[in-house]
């Protein structure tokens, strides 16, 4: 594994342990040249997924890109990073288990919104504003109404 600090390929694993309920191996590494320490994660990749963009372009699925978009929606929210990581892993597992070689970007966005809705309303709204391409304040009002209706529906289940 190449050192992210000096680019040397001579690194050693100092600690290795399971993470995310055994679905991931977390490794602490140290560079033998510069002494830099860093963490890597090893995951099973069932298949290479292609993302079909709205423009018709295809690109390889990038877990880091998914993580960055979710992190952006979660910015300055008090959410446990492990919970976010589990959500991302869950989305990736769902995508891989679909058995489709190509997945529309809209499907990925839908799965992210579904996941964020269970975690944090504000992050859900932030992500939705980009995913649904909000143009004005009424778009925000509509999604807040949608969330409020969902909460009211859930509360009415307990009133019965």
Swiss-Prot record:
Binds 1 zinc ion. InterPro entries: ATP-cone_dom, NrdR-like_N, RNR_NrdR-like. One of its GO terms (molecular function) is zinc ion binding. Keywords: ATP-binding, DNA-binding, Metal-binding, Nucleotide-binding, Repressor, Transcription, Transcription regulation, Zinc, Zinc-finger. Disulfide bonds: none annotated. GO terms for biological process: negative regulation of DNA-templated transcription. Residues 49-139 form the ATP-cone domain. This is Transcriptional repressor NrdR. It comes from Bartonella bacilliformis (strain ATCC 35685 / KC583 / Herrer 020/F12,63).
